[in-house]
Regions:
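Caspase-like cysteine protease fold
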Residues: 443-470, 559-580, 625, 629-684
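Cysteine protease catalytic core and zymogen-processing segment of caspase-like enzymes
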Residues: 437, 541-613, 630
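Contiguous beta-strand segments within globular domains
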Residues: 150-201
């Protein structure tokens, strides 16, 4: 339906053949959602037009009777809200939003109470009579174009004079003011240059708050470490923020500054000084261009983890902020992760009466669950303790660990992790204050309570719209090892049948089948390849840097033992030829050799650099039957338009609560957790 029917009053209109949902952005019902039938809307418009009044001036009170009773955000739906929806009174409506997008509509009708009537993807057809109404000069609000703006950073001394550290090194105990703003130009006094900050403003959004968080171990900071810049729709920021700092010591000294919007990482600036020395000042920037994203969903917690000389610098942002340096070197990190993943493998290989229970079935007896649950909780608890409460942990590290655990023990959160090579099996972290093996609480596993996305931190990070456009249909490729069926039963063929059924019921779905290395390489070397989802169901081997062949030897094994390595991909399908369709890559590596703790070093960076929007991967080998079941349940929800993070959390909880199966924790998201298809392919 055209958004200009009610002129500047309307922000969004969507619906079904029976219902139209409208949001008003100004006037009597500003911010209100109404639900109305096409017939009633047509009558209202005709009556208003009959009085020779412009449609853009139609009063909101004319629609007050159609006001929706309950409006929720997906991220805030809890037990109370679900109960309200389930017991809606007849004639009442409940609307669920995902940001500014309409997600589901519920009605109190006895026939459909508690069931969603529509998805945001369903669009209505406008009756001819409505289309013929003259809309006059009404203007439709729309997303204004993104304006290119720059972060400026400059130093001033105590006398308020500009200070250029590239000309004169700073001195120990000397107090400076470190200043930040956002401007239309990169000014000459800025000690960083051409550092762009882009953001896509929403309709009706005039000013946004950008959080500036400063962290350092090398400088005294005489201010709050977190401040806000207010960025208007156009022009420079409304304000500047300043931090008074003084070097604690001579030599290498670093200041790290993180920029966030609603908990979402935007930009990282690292300023490096040689205090009292002669080494030139330097800086490094890593950032994301958010102007391509229609709506940025808030994140409750952001963890930015940076490589440092002493280990890893961890910056916590959110309701509580903190910074600490983890005295952990890469070899120790690998060993920690290896031990944690051994616990996962202990579940995969659990043997009782000569039966590998988790490999033979998806539904696990409760008695078996109670035997494996304490060992996984111990591994997750031990991993958290080694990170934050080891003998080498200083008070800052321990304090950050306590704060983070306290936050994560409360309400469910969306967690965003940015790191360079600090890659954990985040889902298995067990967040109890003390480990009580006789009373393990599954909700204290991070992955059974929270949504977690892990995004690689790199220069010029590509940000892709989190909606996969399926207006013309969906193209998915199944890249499989058919030999799996010869030894394990019809696991590949069952997935082919699943997709054939989807295709037959949805002519706009195109399924591409590939079984060999050359077929996959041929597709990946073509920038115009049609794949929107690249799904792999095959064996996989992930090599560490120090192992024979290194990362280049990481392998996906297709039919006929056809081995596709990272080396093959880099030579025959190089990253310079980016995939224009920006596919989502799902590597469902089953019954494979144990994956390296740094699988991140192989397939994830290759596909992201190649243009993929992100990767779904596994922490270690997954039983073949479970991999098929996870994929089926995943695509059932994904094709309905649900977001990846919501799918992961729901499936993990569903499989554990209903089947006593913990293996959902084996899967990880290296992609924006709000990624979804739009419009949906199938309905509820």
């Amino acid at each position: 339906m055209d958004d200009n029917i009610l002129g500047s009053q309307v922000f969004q209109i969507a619906g079904t053949k029976e219902h139209i949902i409208i949001k008003f952005v100004n006037g009597d019902l500003a911010g209100t959602y109404i639900i109305i039938s096409p017939e009633d809307l047509e009558i209202k418009l005709k009556l208003w037009k009959a009085n020779d009044k412009p449609l853009c001036n139609i009063p909101g009170k004319a629609f007050e009777v159609y006001k929706i009773d309950f409006v929720y955000q997906v991220a805030n739906i809890g037990a109370y809200e679900r109960d309200q929806i389930k017991h809606l009174e007849e004639g009442k409506y409940a609307l669920v939003l995902n940001g500014n997008n309409i997600d589901k509509l519920f009605t109190g009708s006895p026939k459909t109470r508690g069931k969603p009537l529509m998805k945001e993807s369903l669009k209505i057809e406008i009756p001819t009579a409505v289309l013929s109404v003259d809309t006059g000069d009404a203007q439709t609000p729309s997303n204004p174009p993104s304006v290119k703006r720059f972060i400026n950073v400059w130093l001033k001394d105590r006398a308020d004079n500009l200070y250029d550290p590239k000309v004169k090194p700073i001195e120990k105990d000397q107090v400076f003011t470190l200043n930040f703003d956002i401007d239309l130009i990169s000014r000459s006094e800025s000690i960083v240059s051409d550092t762009v900050l882009n953001y896509n403003f929403l309709p009706g959004e005039d000013v946004v708050a950008v959080t500036v968080r400063l962290e350092t171990d090398d400088f005294d900071v005489f201010d709050e470490r977190e401040k806000k810049l207010f960025l208007p729709l156009s022009g420079p920021s409304k304000n500047r923020v300043s931090f008074s700092i003084a070097p604690k010591h001579d030599g290498d000294s670093t200041v790290t500054v993180v920029f966030l919007k609603d908990g979402n990482f935007i930009q990282l600036i690292t300023l490096k000084f040689d205090v009292g020395g002669n080494v030139p000042y330097s800086r490094n920037e890593l950032g994301r261009d958010l102007s391509v994203v229609e709506f940025i969903q808030p994140r409750d917690i952001n963890l930015t983890i940076l490589n440092s000389i002493d280990g890893y610098q961890l910056i916590l942002s959110g309701a509580v902020g903190a910074m600490a340096t983890l005295a952990i070197k890469l070899p120790e990190l690998k060993e920690m992760i290896r031990e944690a993943r051994q616990a996962l493998m202990g579940i995969v290989n659990y043997n009782e009466n000569n039966r590998f229970i988790f490999q033979d079935q998806v539904s696990i007896p409760e008695a078996v669950n109670q035997k494996v649950l304490p060992s996984l909780a111990e591994a997750g608890y031990r991993l958290y303790q080694r990170i934050f409460f080891s003998p080498s942990s200083d008070p800052n590290v321990q304090n950050l660990g306590k704060k983070l655990r306290q936050i994560l023990q409360s309400e469910p959160c969306k967690i965003q992790v940015f790191s360079q090579d600090f890659v954990l099996p985040w889902g298995i972290l067990y967040l109890a204050d003390r480990l009580d093996r006789a009373n393990i609480q599954p909700s204290l596993f991070l992955g059974l309570r929270h949504i977690i996305e892990h995004i690689p931190l790199q220069k010029d990070m590509l940000v892709i719209e989190n909606k996969i456009n399926c207006a013309s249909g969906l193209n998915i490729s199944l890249n499989v090892n058919k030999d799996i069926d010869k030894t394990m039963g019809p696991l590949v063929s069952s997935q082919e049948k699943y997709w054939e059924a989807i295709r037959l019921n949805n002519p706009n779905v195109k399924v591409i089948y590939r079984t060999t290395k050359n077929e996959v390489l041929s597709a990946l070397e073509d920038p115009k390849a049609s794949d929107q989802v690249l799904y792999f169901y095959c064996h996989g081997i992930s090599q560490d840097v120090e192992e024979t062949g290194g990362v280049d030897a990481s392998t996906l094994i297709l039919s006929g033992n056809d081995k596709l390595t990272i080396k093959d991909l880099s030579i025959d399908a190089p990253i310079v030829d980016r995939l224009l369709n920006e596919p989502l890559v799902f590597i469902n590596a089953c019954e494979s050799a144990e994956l390296s703790p740094l699988v991140f070093d192989g397939f994830v960076p290759y596909f992201v650099a190649k243009g993929a929007r992100g990767v779904i991967g596994t922490e270690c080998k997954v039983p073949a039957k479970f991999a098929v079941e996870w994929a089926r349940r995943f695509f059932d929800r994904f094709l309905k338009g649900e977001a990846l993070g919501e799918i992961f959390l729901a499936l993990r909880q569903e499989l554990y609560n209903d089947e006593h199966n913990l293996l959902g924790l084996l899967y990880a998201l290296y992609v924006d957790c709000d990624t979804r298809i739009f419009p949906s392919i199938i309905s509820d």
